[in-house]
Curated annotation (Swiss-Prot):
GO biological process, one term: heme O biosynthetic process
Keyword Transmembrane: yes
Naturally occurring in which organism (per UniProt): Rippkaea orientalis (strain PCC 8801 / RF-1) (Cyanothece sp. (strain PCC 8801))
Pfam families assigned to the protein according to its UniProt record, in alphabetical order: UbiA
Name of protein: Protoheme IX farnesyltransferase
Length: 323
């Protein structure tokens, strides 16, 4: 039986808006949009159409919000059981499940309509596939049944760069799939670091997250190996694909070294909550800066500066006597 708290009615429309806004889990969405925007800048070689960018980000926001609302509906039983999530709109009784479902459907329809009308059909279909995969594969099939839930389910969170690339080009080449792979491999270290901190919550409601099923030591070993897989993947954009250059590559090296250091520290002390929290926070910082580096590297001005620096370096080298 699914329980809810008896909450007082909303006293005004502002409280209603606040409750529905909370259903969308808004803190999760910006990171998805950053990866979308980075893909668009790379695909357009730094000359992204601002209208297309705006519509794509709005459509992506609506799609992500729809997925999160549906997730809140599905997880209302375990949200009620956990003190940390009991105050959410549905388990607290502030929003009824049927109303939340209607809200989610409206968000999804608006998202697809924006993509189909103002961008292209492929980007809209990809956005909808993210919702379907997140709900059917991650939330329904995997989350409560497999410790690999966020590994496979992480594909849903890796779709935004595909949407962004398709919005610009109308198709998908190798580069967007590398972006997909980067986020896919980034997800386990990011999410398992969080799971290490709230392991008891998941255990309380019988959700088989990796730390609950395999323990901290096994979890941090897997965090370590996924980190080692992810970092080299980030350099594939530079070589062999050549869609990003030296600026991005240099920043990726620095960020990658920092990520490896933090993952190694956690591997050495798997029960240290402070290190787990540090890795979790850094993983967010890492992805944001990596995507920012992609954008900066793609700009025509950056290319001009790098060419000028290369020419000056060649000139200096030519002045050095060979013997």
């Amino acid at each position: 039986m699914i329980g809810t708290n008896v909450a007082p009615r909303h006293e005004n429309w502002l409280q209603v808006v606040k409750s529905y806004y909370q259903l969308t889990k808004p803190r999760i969405i910006p990171l998805l949009l950053i990866t979308t925007a980075a893909a668009m800048w790379i695909a357009s070689e730094g000359r992204v159409d601002l209208f297309t960018l705006f519509i794509t980000l709005i459509g992506g926001t609506l799609a992500a919000a729809a997925a999160q609302v549906m997730n809140c509906i599905y997880d209302r039983d375990i949200d009620y059981e956990m003190l940390r999530t009991r105050a959410r709109p549905i388990p607290s009784g502030r929003v009824q499940s049927r109303h939340a479902f209607i809200f989610a459907v409206i968000l999804a329809i608006l998202s697809f309509s924006l993509f189909a009308l103002f961008v292209n059909l492929l980007s809209g279909l990809l956005a909808m596939s993210g919702i379907v995969f997140y709900m059917l594969v991650y939330t329904h099939l995997l989350k409560r049944n497999s410790p690999q839930n966020i590994v496979i389910g992480g594909a849903a969170g890796s779709i935004p760069p595909l949407v962004g690339w398709a919005a610009v080009t109308g198709d998908l080449g190798w580069a967007p799939w590398i972006l997909f792979a980067i986020i896919f491999l980034w997800t386990p270290p990011h999410f398992w670091a969080l799971a290490l901190m709230i392991k008891d919550d998941y255990a309380q409601v019988n959700v088989p997250m990796m730390p609950v099923v395999e323990g901290e030591e096994s979890t941090v070993r897997q965090i370590w190996w996924y980190t080692l897989l992810m970092i080299p993947c980030t350099f594939l954009l530079v070589y062999p694909l050549g869609v990003s250059g030296a600026v991005y590559g240099g920043i990726a090296i620095i960020l990658g070294a920092m990520f490896i250091q933090k993952a190694w520290q956690l591997k050495q002390a798997p029960f240290d909550q402070v290190l787990a929290r540090s890795l979790f926070k850094f993983s967010i910082f890492y992805l944001m800066l990596l995507c920012t580096a992609m954008v900066i590297d793609s700009l025509p001005l950056t290319h001009q500066v790098m060419v000028a620096l290369g020419d000056n370096l060649n000139l200096l080298l030519s002045l050095i006597p060979l013997n």
